Regions:
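Glycine- and acidic
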Residues: 72-74
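Partner-binding and oligomerization surfaces adjacent to conserved cores of proteins
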Residues: 50, 67-69
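A contiguous, surface-oriented mixed alpha/beta subdomain in the mid-to-C-terminal portion of proteins
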Residues: 1-37, 41-45, 50-51, 56-59, ...
C-alpha cells in the first residue's frame, strides 16, 4: 500500500522548506503541490505538498521530514491504495469552502475560504466537524491518516479499507455552526500566534522552543476552560501570562480569587491582575525556569523512549508483510 507524507510548508521557516525540497530531490521522490491549479496556486511552493514515500523509507529521509517538518507540527502521514495523482485530485477538490451571506447583514455576499485540513495541528479533527456524508466522502480516499498532537503523542484516524477518489464538485458550505466548530479547533494556535505577534518583546521567548510554546499554549487553553474562563480575553490573558511569567500560572494560589472572579464575570482577569503585589510576580518569575525545565522533560522523554524502543513498537509501524 502506498504511503505518503503530507507536509504543510507554510508552517516552516524558509531554511526548513529548502531542506525539505532538497530532500525530495535527493531521494528522487514524486510530489504533488496541492495548491497547484487552485485559487491559491501562487502559494504552491509554500502550501501543502503530498510526497509519495518509498516502500522502505531511508533513515535519512525520515530524519529530514522529522527535523524540518515534524518538529514544527507540519507533518502528517497518509496510507492509501490510490496512486499519487488520483489522491492529489481528491485532496485538491476538498480545499475550498464557501461562507454563505449573513442574512442579518444587508448586501452581504458569500466568500470563499481555504479548508485547512492539511494543517496537522487541526487537520485530523476537522472532518469530524463536517456533516457525516461529507466526512465519509473525504475519508474514503484514505486507509489511515496519522499525525502528532501538541505533546508529540501519536494520533491516528481510520479511513476506508477500500479506497477511492471522491472529488467534490463544489466548495463545502460553511454555515455559522460549522464555522464556530472549526474556529474552536484552532483556539490555542490563534492565541499563541497573537501573543507572539503582539505581547512579547523581541527575543523574550527565545529560551523556549516553539514546540514547547505550542504544548504550553494547549495546556493553558485547557486550564482556562477547566477554570471556567469563558471570555476570550480572559483565556488570552492566562495564556500570555503562562508563556511570559510561569507555565503553571493557572495553579498560582495568589491568583485563584482573581481567576474565580473572572470565571463568574465579576471582573476581567486583565483588570484584576493590576492589583497583584509585585512580590507575587517576582516569586513566579524566579520559580519559572525550574518548572519550565520539568515541562520540557515531560515533552521530550516520551520521544526519547520511542527512539530507544524496537521499531515494531512504534504506533505507526506497518509490518513488511503489509507493505505493497
Amino acid at each position: 500500500m502506498p504511503r505518503y507524507a503530507l507536509v504543510e510548508l507554510g508552517q516552516c521557516e524558509m531554511a526548513e522548506r529548502e531542506a525539505i525540497a532538497l530532500g525530495v530531490r535527493a531521494h528522487g521522490l514524486e510530489v504533488e503541490r496541492l495548491f497547484e491549479g487552485t485559487p491559491e496556486s501562487e502559494l504552491a511552493d509554500q502550501g501543502p505538498w503530498l510526497i509519495q514515500l518509498p516502500v522502505q523509507p531511508s533513515g535519512a529521509l525520515l530524519e529530514t521530514l522529522a527535523l524540518h517538518a515534524g518538529v514544527h507540527h507540519a507533518l502528517s502521514m497518509v496510507g492509501s491504495s490510490l496512486a499519487l495523482g488520483d489522491l492529489a485530485i481528491h485532496m485538491r477538490s476538498w480545499l475550498e469552502g464557501l461562507i454563505p451571506p449573513d442574512p442579518t447583514i444587508e448586501g452581504d455576499e458569500s466568500c470563499g475560504a481555504v479548508l485547512r485540513w492539511f494543517d496537522p495541528r487541526i487537520g485530523l479533527e476537522m472532518p469530524g466537524c463536517w456533516p457525516a456524508a461529507d466526512r465519509q466522502q473525504f475519508m474514503q480516499a484514505f486507509q489511515w491518516w496519522a499525525a502528532w498532537r501538541a505533546d508529540f503523542s501519536p494520533r491516528m484516524v481510520q479511513g476506508s479499507i477500500l479506497n477511492r477518489a471522491a472529488p467534490r464538485a463544489e466548495p463545502l458550505p460553511l454555515d455559522q455552526t460549522l464555522l464556530l466548530a472549526l474556529d474552536q479547533l484552532n483556539t490555542a494556535e490563534t492565541m499563541l500566534a497573537s501573543v507572539r505577534e503582539n505581547d512579547i518583546e523581541p527575543g523574550e521567548l527565545d529560551h523556549m522552543a516553539p514546540a514547547l510554546q505550542r504544548r504550553l499554549a494547549h495546556q493553558l487553553s485547557d486550564d482556562a476552560r477547566r477554570l471556567g474562563l469563558g471570555e476570550w480575553a480572559d483565556q488570552y490573558m492566562l495564556l500570555a501570562m503562562g508563556l511570559r511569567l510561569h507555565p503553571d500560572i493557572a495553579k498560582a494560589q495568589a491568583l485563584q480569587p482573581m481567576i474565580a472572579a473572572a470565571a463568574t464575570g465579576e471582573q476581567g482577569l486583565g483588570a484584576a491582575i493590576a492589583d497583584v503585589d509585585n512580590a507575587v510576580w517576582q516569586d513566579l518569575v524566579e520559580a519559572a525556569p525550574q518548572v519550565l525545565a520539568l515541562h520540557s522533560h515531560a515533552l521530550l522523554e516520551p520521544l526519547r523512549q520511542r527512539r530507544l524502543a524496537a521499531v515494531s513498537a512504534h504506533p505507526f509501524h506497518i509490518p513488511r508483510t503489509e507493505v505493497r
